[in-house]
Amino acid sequence: MSVPDKFFGRYQLDKSENFDEFLSSKGVNWFVRQMIKLAGLTKIISQNQEAGKYNMENLTSKKNTNYQAWELGKKFEAPGLDGNQHEITFDFKDEILSEHHIRLNEPETSAETYFYTIDDQNQLVMRMENNGIVCRRWFKRVEQK
């Protein structure tokens, strides 16, 4: 099992659907939601130099994350965009790349999974769900890796 080449590249956030509603359902207050929505987001997905390992970067105007040399199906710990330490697992199944996070400071209530696909416009589409609210975010490819 490996991540297909079509996922590798640099992507910039283009548009979102139900993002404010999604954040609200997670208890994020109005002011913080506005700050999050204003922050640009670039995602970079690439192969690592080591065979079978990958990298993902999230670049924002506030904070960056850089997950290096992860393997599909293997847990690792790293800081999330919220500044907390997370247990993270990436997986790939049925043409969907998933990114599962558990905040180590609240493992019982903090599980989140992000699902990534490549649409027919060659955009990275991220899907998240909470309390029945489905959020999608589209990222335009700005360069091939």
Curated annotation (Swiss-Prot):
Keyword flag Transport: yes
Domain of life, per lineage: Eukaryota
InterPro entries: Calycin, Fatty_acid-bd, Lbp1-4
Annotated coiled-coil segments of the chain: none
Keyword Glycoprotein part of the UniProt annotation: no
Keywords from the UniProt entry: Lipid-binding, Transport
MF annotations from Gene Ontology: lipid binding
Gene3D superfamilies per UniProt: 2.40.128.20
SUPFAM superfamilies named in the record: Lipocalins
Family assignment from sequence similarity: Belongs to the calycin superfamily. Fatty-acid binding protein (FABP) family.
Entry protein name: Fatty acid-binding protein homolog 4
Native organism taxonomy: Eukaryota, Metazoa, Ecdysozoa, Nematoda, Chromadorea
